[in-house]
């Protein structure tokens, strides 16, 4: 196994940019999205110092229940190593229920990640996405399993669960709280975020944003993780 693969397995596999996102179960038919998101650790400890990652993706919802998404570039700088591109990903969101049809709205996520780091395995991810809206308050839960595949793969499943609770002051301002837990490395984090959407006048286009900071709940998590996301949507 190369040094790069070892670093990916021992540090990068514990947290990637797609670990710090709470996926929505909703699909908007015919909408195209271009998204950039990432994170940066703010922790002087050697196993977290200068760690950061980012990824850019494009998606298009061909129908009202399926949204495929391609991650064109996934960048990572693991603590103690140089930054590099680490692979690509094909992700699918399936909306399983109509919004408001049942007590909660349900979707499903399924993805395949191809790693370009020599000696590192690919991975599949899957799991349910659940959202409950009550008035202006929305709560979203993700339950995601990850399994390494192909050469060098571990036989174990890794599990993470995520939570987002936001209050809609206006379309452009939704303050809230996000929480993340990864049982594979016992890292638990939670903190405030602000999100929103701006409609571009006289168009069918929108610009979404999300920024926040996660605080480490236990010693296995970074003390602070800064998050940022921007998304351009159009029909």
Residue spans for each PLM region:
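Bacterial N-terminal signal peptides
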Residues: 2-10
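Transmembrane beta-barrel domains of Gram-negative outer membranes and organellar outer membranes
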Residues: 15-235
